[in-house]
Amino acid sequence: MTETKEERVHQVFEKIYKRYDVMNSVISFQRHKAWRKDTMKRMNVQEGQSALDVCCGTADWAIALGKAVGPTGHVEGLDFSENMLSIGKKKIADERLDHVFLRHGNAMELPYADDTFDFVTIGFGLRNVPDYMQVLREMARVTKPGGKVVCLETSQPTIPVFKQLYFFYFRHVMPLFGKMFAKSYDEYSWLQESTLSFPGRDRLAQMFKEVGLTDVQVKPYSGGAAAMHLGVKESYDEESRNVTC
């Protein structure tokens, strides 16, 4: 029987979870932390707000959100890999963030009511889901009117020489790093496949608009190796005005 994308991705993350954080730093040359820090600055998270991190993995972004909203806020992280969540739960306990909660679940069907969170984020996870649009629709659904949907993801550089180097790195070097540091050549071969097949920045921005998000911002990082996409969910008052105009 043919293995689905969802099944394969689940197997990948259930296997590499122990070395995932180390490999993130190796693969991105530590730049992923700076990308997330700049993204958080652009989000302008305030104390007391609420956030959901979809495909939260080992909870680095959920932890950053938890620190930003403070003890009066509320943060949820959701992932379908229980092994990844086990690492995240330990990190949250070490940080003593009692207002950050992790849940096992599917990004394709978020177990939350409409209009629940001020922010809904996904970091380096959208490329791994079976249906990009379905996940974006779900993220928009659970975001409050006026709230923000944010994606930080690998991207595809457009500068000719850098683009060639980037593709060479992902096709040939990254799987070798996976074998060296995580003993997982096949798993990191899959991750490079998902990266190279992911939509470019312009297409992803259009997808944000297609699920009803407005004021879409795009910020490339490190020559386009990664990019942030941020969109705002219209308030119901704005939607009503648009209908009557």
Curated annotation (Swiss-Prot):
Pathway named in the protein's UniProt entry: Quinol/quinone metabolism; menaquinone biosynthesis; menaquinol from 1,4-dihydroxy-2-naphthoate: step 2/2
GO BP annotations listed: menaquinone biosynthetic process; methylation
EC number of the protein: 2.1.1.163
CDD domains in the cross-refs: AdoMet_MTases (cd02440)
Name of the protein: Demethylmenaquinone methyltransferase
Leading EC class: transferase
Gene Ontology terms, MF aspect: demethylmenaquinone methyltransferase activity
Gene from which this protein is expressed: menG
Top-rank lineage group of the source organism: Bacteria
InterPro entries: MenG_heptapren, SAM-dependent_MTases_sf, UbiE/COQ5_MeTrFase, UbiE/COQ5_MeTrFase_CS
Function, as annotated: Methyltransferase required for the conversion of demethylmenaquinol (DMKH2) to menaquinol (MKH2).
Pfam families: Ubie_methyltran
Species whose genome carries this gene: Halalkalibacterium halodurans (strain ATCC BAA-125 / DSM 18197 / FERM 7344 / JCM 9153 / C-125) (Bacillus halodurans)
